[in-house]
């Protein structure tokens, strides 16, 4: 059996192992035997989804090219979990009390359950994650090619582009099977979390094993390794203070705004107290992941031939010394890093697309007289999530093809970080400032996103691909102040720092300025009070009044989304809560609040609010709720 066939078998076997682990975890949770799944250490290991193929392969290449600058990628998350864990706790509490399913759902819920804002946040998340998906495809494709050599060019793979296509297809198939079995996105995915925890251990063990081999097997011990580091060009790199600060900020922002991080950190959180454990255990994990980066980079530069790709030193160093077993472990570690990121990111993005794009379109068709069979709604949501997963992987593959797949892994990752960070002002502002408005959030996010697109994403394809060489040199439309990498005539800056500075500063300034000029709607004010004072009002949501709904109508609507058994169980429990016989409660405001929160786990807060409002016929915020907001504002 050729080495390429061995790699295929190993990958399939590893995926099968993940399926078994996930299946056993789901069965244990279904039987109520999931106390070990709720361990704070399992939660901490799930946060390792931050460490993708970029940190497994690309950190070494980053160190070889830029010295200690690679540490900024670990420093940002460390500062967040150590210094800002109280903010993470608030974020988790908001997610639980509002039944938030994604970053877009959080933004939508905070700003008056605006689906327009949710749609835009979803587009930002999808487009911002696309380079990151391409990064995973590139890393897996490069590792296949390096390991298998000439065998990787045989049909049906042909070349790296064809190989990337098959990798994308396989990851899409795996993710669809893995992550779309449950409709309620707010339910805990015990199987997925357990599989991520296993992958966290695998990639850490693989990287440490390679590091030990490099230090004691190739460099001659710790003292000899330190001497090599001192003599290496890596020690001569002098990082720019501006770039160092910018990258640290970017990695911290990405830790909060990456869709996959929000999924595991907020949606999958079982207990807020787990954040205390994560505040020291996760930085320890990051330290171990970064411990051997410089030694591997230094020894790789010394032993590997000139022109060798430093992004692959973790794999090619063992191969060059005939250590196929260690190289296979390294390959599995890199494959594990890529698959875990793709699975969780695709799950999170597909939830956003189905909740904030597909379901609103369905509601619009229904309102305009379209015919939709009641029993098809669950199928529509699940199908849309599966198609979205395939679409996300297709976008990643398209970016890989257009960009040529030749950029350094770290460069691709930083482009993605900068795009997803545009959500940060609206997110943090909404958590701590009642005066933040939907208009402010939309204005800031739109300006920041388009500046990132113009200054960083489109130029990443190269001159003449998307933006013409004339645009690079003379500016858009011949306007010199609209050059992508010298905006407003500012020249001489690092392109990444330039794009981040303009996009984030104008995003934040416009968010604040427009919020000060506009007035929030009553629902925005109510949601703002719930978010800012979440620890005082964790259980409350917006009120309902003025409705004319019948319980039967609400039951029919709930069955379309939740399914018959779950909807009947929920309605019966609510009827019992009201002291009524049977399974139809009175449509009082408290019941409608809980029904909306229940539905939001499946279709998102904005769509759930719209569906209940549509069924009610007319819905407004109650006077009592407005008085409560006024009282809180006065305090």
Model-derived regions, located:
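Membrane-embedded helix-loop-helix hairpins and adjacent transmembrane boundary segments
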Residues: 1-587
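Intracellular, membrane-proximal regulatory regions of polytopic membrane proteins
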Residues: 555-628
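Short, charged amphipathic alpha-helical "coupling" segments at sensory-output junctions
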Residues: 632-635
């Amino acid at each position: 059996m050729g080495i390429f066939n061995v790699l295929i078998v190993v990958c399939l076997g590893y995926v099968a192992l993940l399926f078994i682990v996930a299946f056993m975890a789901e069965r244990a949770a279904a039987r109520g035997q999931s106390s070990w799944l709720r361990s704070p250490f399992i939660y901490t290991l799930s946060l390792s989804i931050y460490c993708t193929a970029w940190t497994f392969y690309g950190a070494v290449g980053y160190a070889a090219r830029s010295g200690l600058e690679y540490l900024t990628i670990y420093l940002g998350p460390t500062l967040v979990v150590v210094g800002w864990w109280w903010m993470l706790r608030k974020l988790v509490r908001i997610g639980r009390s509002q039944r938030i399913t994604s970053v877009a759902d959080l933004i939508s819920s905070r700003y008056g359950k605006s689906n327009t804002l949710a749609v835009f946040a979803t587009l930002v998340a999808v487009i911002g994650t696309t380079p990151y998906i391409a990064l995973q495809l590139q890393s897996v494709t490069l590792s296949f090619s390096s390991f298998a050599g000439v065998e990787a060019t045989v049909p049906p793979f042909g070349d790296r582009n064809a190989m990337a296509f098959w990798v994308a297809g396989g990851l899409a198939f795996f993710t669809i099977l893995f992550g779309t079995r449950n409709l309620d996105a707010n339910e805990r995915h015990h199987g997925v979390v357990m599989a991520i925890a296993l992958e966290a251990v695998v990639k850490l063990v693989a990287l440490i094993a390679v590091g030990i081999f490099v230090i004691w097997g190739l460099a001659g011990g710790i003292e000899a390794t330190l001497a090599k580091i001192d003599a290496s060009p890596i020690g001569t790199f002098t990082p720019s203070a501006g770039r160092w600060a910018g990258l640290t900020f970017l990695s911290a922002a990405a830790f909060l705004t990456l869709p996959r991080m929000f999924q595991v950190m907020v949606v999958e959180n079982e207990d807020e107290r787990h954040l205390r454990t994560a505040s020291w255990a996760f930085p320890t994990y990051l330290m171990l992941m970064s411990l051997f980066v410089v030694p591997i980079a230094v020894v790789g530069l010394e032993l590997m031939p000139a022109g060798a790709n430093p992004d692959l030193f973790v794999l090619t160093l063992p191969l060059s010394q005939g250590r196929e077993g260690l190289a296979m472990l390294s390959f599995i570690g890199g494959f594990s890093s890529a698959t875990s990121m793709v699975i969780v990111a695709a799950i999170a993005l597909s939830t956003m697309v189905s909740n904030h794009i597909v379901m609103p379109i369905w509601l619009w068709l229904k309102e305009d007289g379209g015919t939709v069979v009641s029993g098809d709604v669950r199928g529509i949501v699940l199908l849309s999530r599966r198609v979205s997963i395939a679409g996300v992987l297709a976008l990643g593959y398209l970016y890989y093809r257009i960009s040529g797949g030749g950029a350094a892994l770290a460069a691709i990752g930083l482009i993605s970080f900068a795009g997803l960070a545009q959500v940060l002002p609206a997110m943090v502002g909404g958590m701590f400032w009642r005066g933040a408005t939907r208009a402010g959030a939309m204005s800031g996010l739109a300006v920041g996103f388009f500046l990132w697109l113009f200054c960083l994403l489109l130029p990443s394809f190269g001159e003449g691909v998307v933006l013409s060489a004339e645009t690079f040199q003379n500016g858009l439309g011949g306007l010199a102040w609209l050059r992508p990498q010298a905006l407003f005539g500012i020249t001489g800056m690092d392109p990444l720092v330039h794009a981040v500075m303009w996009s984030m500063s104008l995003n934040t300034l416009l968010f604040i300025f427009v919020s000060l000029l506009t007035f929030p709607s009553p629902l925005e004010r109510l949601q703002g009070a719930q978010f800012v004072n979440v620890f005082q009002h964790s259980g409350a949501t917006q009120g309902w009044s003025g409705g004319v709904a019948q319980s039967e109508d609400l039951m029919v609507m709930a069955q379309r989304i939740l399914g018959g058994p779950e909807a009947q169980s929920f309605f019966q429990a609510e009827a019992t809560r009201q002291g009524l016989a049977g399974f139809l409660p009175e449509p009082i405001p408290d019941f409608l609040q809980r029904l909306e929160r229940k539905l939001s786990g499946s279709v998102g807060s904005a769509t759930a609010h719209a569906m209940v409002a549509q069924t009610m016929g007319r819905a407004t915020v109650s006077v009592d709720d407005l008085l409560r907001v006024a009282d809180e504002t006065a305090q």
